[in-house]
Amino acid sequence: MSQVVQTRRLQAVDLIKRKAEGRKIISLTAYHAHTAGIVDAYCDFVLVGDSLGMVMHGMESTLPVTLEMMILQAQAVMRGTSRALVVVDMPFGSYEASREQAFLNAARVLKETGAGAIKLEGGARFAETVAFLTERGVPVMGHIGLTPQSVNTMGGFKVQGHGAGDEDRLRADARAISDAGAFAIVLEGIVEPVARAIATDPAIRAATIGIGATAACDGQILVLEDMLGLSDRVPRFVKSYGSLRAHIEEAVRAYADEVQAGRFPAEGHTYPPR
């Protein structure tokens, strides 16, 4: 795939245009400037996900992630990118209490990072919050289905859509978020027929972004470390496009062996006298 030459950074409205044009939306997560710089050339938007708590810090869930952590990593991602829209997750506890709390924290994220949008989890019950934010100039990406911040109430990371009435509930969630002004909605961990019904619903104007959902979504997203083969455990929906963990282990092993044997540093890696 060739890199895209572009003079301005993509915005939320561009994802809606891609949906209208039938162009697939490509996304990956990033938490560092250097990885963000690599994916920037190929992604329409880069998500600074609260998954950084698990990927970077070894947390058991995303719940302990703070707003300060999100802002710090989003600043790094913004430095590493120049064309992709950067979307920042609102962490658990930063938007649920009230619409006003959500706006103050979302505004802080946008002001301190320069990112182009925020993402929050939840369906119809957060429609008023989405509307409150969008009316005040905050582009919002929604997130329904398997919502990791609800892991305790869901009883774990469980695929959604198996139960009676789940399709109607999830479709109502997507419609409510879309009607409230969300420019895109992540559909995560939803059984394929239900996800397809939502993704092809003409009443949903927002772009649908799948992760463990359906190819019928307007776009797809994966956690970068998962698709590169760096993570220890990955969900069923992840396809491995690399084996970075094995390559890193091989490189570290070679380094350790050379140091132990006295072969590193060699003459070419030291400074001779003038």
UniProtKB/Swiss-Prot annotation:
**Catalytic residues per the record?**
188 (proton acceptor)
Keywords, alphabetical: Cytoplasm, Magnesium, Metal-binding, Pantothenate biosynthesis, Transferase
Which Pfam families does the record associate with it? Pantoate_transf
Catalytic reactions of this protein: 3-methyl-2-oxobutanoate + (6R)-5,10-methylene-5,6,7,8-tetrahydrofolate + H2O = 2-dehydropantoate + (6S)-5,6,7,8-tetrahydrofolate
GO BP field: pantothenate biosynthetic process
Record: residues binding 3-methyl-2-oxobutanoate = 50-51, 89, 119
Q: In which pathway does it act?
A: Cofactor biosynthesis; (R)-pantothenate biosynthesis; (R)-pantoate from 3-methyl-2-oxobutanoate: step 1/2
The source's domain of life comes to Bacteria
The residues that hold Mg(2+) are 50, 89, 121
Compartments where located: Cytoplasm
GO MF entry, a single one:
3-methyl-2-oxobutanoate hydroxymethyltransferase activity
Could you tell me the EC number(s) of this protein? 2.1.2.11
Q: Does the keyword Iron-sulfur apply?
A: no
Checking SUPFAM superfamilies in the record gives:
Phosphoenolpyruvate/pyruvate domain
GO CC, sorted alphabetically, is:
cytoplasm
Per its Swiss-Prot or TrEMBL entry, what cofactor is needed? Mg(2+)
Cofactor remark: Binds 1 Mg(2+) ion per subunit.
Name which cysteines form disulfide bonds: none
The similarity comment for this entry is:
Belongs to the PanB family.
Question: What the protein does?
Answer: Catalyzes the reversible reaction in which hydroxymethyl group from 5,10-methylenetetrahydrofolate is transferred onto alpha-ketoisovalerate to form ketopantoate.
How this chain assembles, per its entry, is: Homodecamer; pentamer of dimers.
User: What protein name applies here?
Assistant: 3-methyl-2-oxobutanoate hydroxymethyltransferase
Q: State the species of origin.
A: Methylorubrum extorquens (strain PA1)
Show the taxonomic lineage: Bacteria, Pseudomonadati, Pseudomonadota, Alphaproteobacteria, Hyphomicrobiales
